[in-house]
């Protein structure tokens, strides 16, 4: 029973890494810096409810942030998101 749970956890972790790692790679600049506007939205690890804004590749969209974790593609207002991520 314990082995099955362990294997399930390893499989889940592997799938999460396969999904997340390419997204992080595509968010890198040529000099290795991460472009936060290309990161996927991430609600974080907690269950609190904060309305935040993230850039989805074309525009800023509202999402719910849990209050801990996540990534830097998170802004308190649509204006702050557009100022940082909208390309002129």
UniProtKB/Swiss-Prot annotation:
Signal peptide start and end residues: 1-27
SMART domains assigned to the protein according to its UniProt record, in alphabetical order: KU
One function term, GO molecular function aspect: toxin activity
Species assigned in the record: Cyriopagopus hainanus (Chinese bird spider)
Residues the record marks as site: May bind Kv1: 39
Tissues expressed in: Expressed by the venom gland.
GO CC field: extracellular space
Protein name in UniProt: Kunitz-type U15-theraphotoxin-Hhn1k
